[in-house]
Swiss-Prot record:
Positions of FAD binding: G13, G14, G15, H16, A17, G18
Natural source organism: Pseudomonas savastanoi pv. phaseolicola (strain 1448A / Race 6)
Pfam families with a match to the protein in the record: GIDA, GIDA_C_1st, SAM_GIDA_C
Binding sites annotated in the UniProt record for NAD(+): 273-287
Chief subcellular location: cytoplasm
Family: Belongs to the MnmG family.
Name of the featured protein: tRNA uridine 5-carboxymethylaminomethyl modification enzyme MnmG
Keyword Metal-binding (UniProt): no
Gene behind the chain: mnmG
Molecular function as annotated in GO: flavin adenine dinucleotide binding
Cofactors named for this entry: FAD
Protein task: NAD-binding protein involved in the addition of a carboxymethylaminomethyl (cmnm) group at the wobble position (U34) of certain tRNAs, forming tRNA-cmnm(5)s(2)U34.
Length: 630
């Protein structure tokens, strides 16, 4: 059989964005091609061996709720699991997993190779076929022309990638992989705003040369958490500990005395690095008053001695890297397996994208991941899933979809990017979401799985499990509501004694659960029955205890919904709207917001300007009605 020359969707790149994009498109029944420069690196964790964390796990759970692969692969490859912020409220709790790189990558590849409607082909993409402002396909490195209705670019750090170690640099997409030069040049010819960003990675250490006895052990949680809504702890490989050590005055002295050899501080690197994952050079420069910084020693896997020293990312020369590492307690005799480095790469201003992640100037061309200025596997995976979904919807002739800010962290991520743009690598935090009590990691499936089913992203097995869970939550809430406890009875006295809360009158169990001192597990232990599914029990408890706050947020969302959903015509001429300042006209003209809500979040666009836009829309609507009736 000849290799197909036409697909409905082509995805370029096999990293975290590309794999989720290709899988999403194929799950929707669309003929999809995943082009990668190397099949062996599909799903590769290029930087730290971890998935999740504050804000990030919310994205992973949302990807999972929509049928994506990241959470399931984490459960199969995770060698340590912890819940961060476990003593805080449910809105900011976050699951984080250390992952075995080999196992994680194998899980992703297995998923890809067993996905119907998905073809995988090892070829670099050198060019796009664009006709009349519409993408028509791609041209590969060996000159193959492959056509498609939509193309999703998930190029990571490969576009014009330049690797720096000290004052030396060379072209590369990441260590050991070639960059994408021809495609980068082609994209720069398009009417899109382009910039340069930078990221980095620390040297890798041979664990046999490390003294763990002087470090602080950091074991995983017990019982072991799971990442996927369909996951279970039986899927997990053997679990291991991480370790904590610290930099010291000697470490900082070594770095400070060698800043003139840093490509970042000597002006060689032009790209801006990630604010929330700075290099060790950046840390000692920005936080000069700090005497030490934590270094988390993270195992890379079960079948390797390599360690990832999280916290000392650097692009200093190798001889300086060795001095830095060996100045840290427990690593005095450490052997470096791979040097750390920084990498500069092209990214494109995400304000040139629609909510669907389709470019505004080239129809059918979608961007996802680091090409949009983000950093992190989770942010990339979320964008990939959304871009792949919308590429498939376009091929099917259906309307595009993007969750709102009050529906998902994916919605927050995309809205931030296309409205505000970014001058530095963008990372997700719970603090970026104004409705975070509703957007918890534990209820991502309740928020999104039904929509995923409607879109064609969710298979029968996941849908059946979700429906069972949702029904169980409703049944347990009804049971608690209809079960009463009276003062003076054995159960009433037991509750009063256990919780130190005497009952003054008859209560149903749901009322009792609203009290801060009463938890679900203890209440059920006294009253009997109850739910054995921990996911169901968690939902019942959180929904009950925070019902007042949740209702308040829902009311606020309902009030804002009208303006949020009001569409702004694509052909609107902001310069013709009387009363708008030149500055606001310019900002609206550059961003071209899709809705009134998006316009209101553009920096410098005032409430008065939004009122003028509303008046203009009403006049425009009235004028069109008169034309139609004439």
């Amino acid at each position: 059989m000849d290799f197909p020359s036409r697909f409905e969707v082509i995805v370029i790149g096999g990293g975290h964005a590309g794999t989720e994009a290709a899988l999403a498109s194929a799950r929707m029944g669309v003929k999809t091609l995943l082009l990668t420069h190397n099949v062996e690196t599909l799903g590769q964790m290029s930087c730290n061996p971890a998935i999740g964390g504050i804000g990030k796990s919310h994205l992973v759970k949302e990807i999972d709720a929509l049928g994506g692969a990241m959470a399931m692969a984490t459960d199969k490859g995770g060698i340590q699991f912890r819940v961060l912020n476990s003593r805080k409220g449910p809105a900011v709790r976050a699951t984080r997993a250390q992952a075995d790189r080999v196992l994680y990558k194998a899980a992703i590849r297995e998923t890809l190779e067993n996905q119907p409607n998905l073809w995988i082909f090892q070829q670099a993409c050198d060019d796009l076929i664009v006709e009349q402002d519409q993408v028509r396909g791609v041209v590969t490195q060996m000159g193959m022309r492959i056509f498609a209705d939509s193309v999703v670019l998930t190029t990571g750090t490969f576009l014009g990638g330049l690797i720096h170690i000290g004052m030396q640099n060379y072209s590369g997409g990441r260590a050991g992989d070639p960059p994408s030069i021809a495609l980068a040049q082609r994209l720069r010819e398009l009417p899109l705003r382009v910039g340069r960003l930078k990221t980095g990675t620390p040297p890798r250490i041979d664990g046999r040369s490390v003294d763990f006895s002087v470090m602080t052990e950091q074991p995983g949680d017990t019982p072991i958490p799971v990442m996927s809504f369909l996951g279970n702890k039986e899927q997990h490989p053997p679990q291991v500990s991480c370790w904590i050590t610290h930099t010291n005055a000697r470490t900082h002295e070594i770095i400070a005395s060698n800043l003139d050899r840093s490509p970042m501080y000597s002006g060689v690197i032009e790209g801006i690095g990630p604010r929330y994952c700075p290099s060790i050079e950046d840390k000692i420069h920005r936080f000069a008053d700090k005497e030490s910084h934590q270094v988390f020693i993270e195992p890379e896997g079960l079948t390797t001695h390599e360690l990832y020293p999280n916290g000392i990312s650097t692009s200093l020369p190798f001889d300086v890297q060795l001095q830095i590492v060996q100045s840290i307690r427990g690593m005095e005799n450490a052997h470096i397996v791979r040097p750390g480095y920084a990498i500069e790469y092209d990214y494109f201003d995400p304000r040139d994208l629609k909510y669907s992640l389709e470019t505004k100037v080239i129809g059918g061309l979608f961007f996802a991941g680091q090409i949009n200025g983000t950093t992190g596997y989770e942010e990339a995976g979320a964008q990939g899933l959304l871009a792949g979904t919308n590429a498939a919807l376009r091929a099917q002739g259906r309307d595009s979809w993007c969750p709102r800010r009050d529906e998902a962290y994916i919605g927050v991520l995309v809205d931030d990017l296309i409205t505000l743009g970014t001058q530095e690598p963008y990372r997700m935090f719970t603090s970026r979401a104004e409705y975070r009590l509703i957007l918890r990691e534990d209820n991502a499936d309740l928020r999104l799985t039904e929509k995923g089913r409607e879109l064609g992203l969710v298979d029968d097995a996941r849908w059946a499990a979700f429906c069972t869970k949702r029904e169980s939550i409703e049944l347990e809430e009804q049971r608690l509501k209809s079960t009463w406890v009276r003062p003076g009875t054995a159960q009433g006295d037991a509750i009063a004694e256990h919780f130190g809360t005497p009952l003054t009158h008859e209560y149903n169990l749901l009322n009792l659960l609203t009290r801060p001192e009463i938890d679900y597990a203890s209440l059920i232990a006294i009253t009997g029955q109850g739910c054995t599914d921990p996911q169901v029990a968690e939902q019942v408890e959180i929904k009950t205890k925070y019902s007042g706050y949740i209702d308040r947020q829902q009311d606020e969302i309902a009030r804002l919904r009208a303006s949020e959903d009001t569409r702004l015509p694509e052909d609107i001429d902001y310069a013709a709207i009387s009363g708008l300042s030149k500055e606001i006209q310019s900002k609206l003209g550059i961003t071209r917001p899709e809705t009134l809500g998006q316009a209101s979040r553009i920096p410098g666009v005032t409430p008065a300007a939004i009122s003028l836009l509303m008046i203009h829309l009403k006049k425009r609507g009235a004028g069109r009605q008169l034309e139609q009736s004439a």
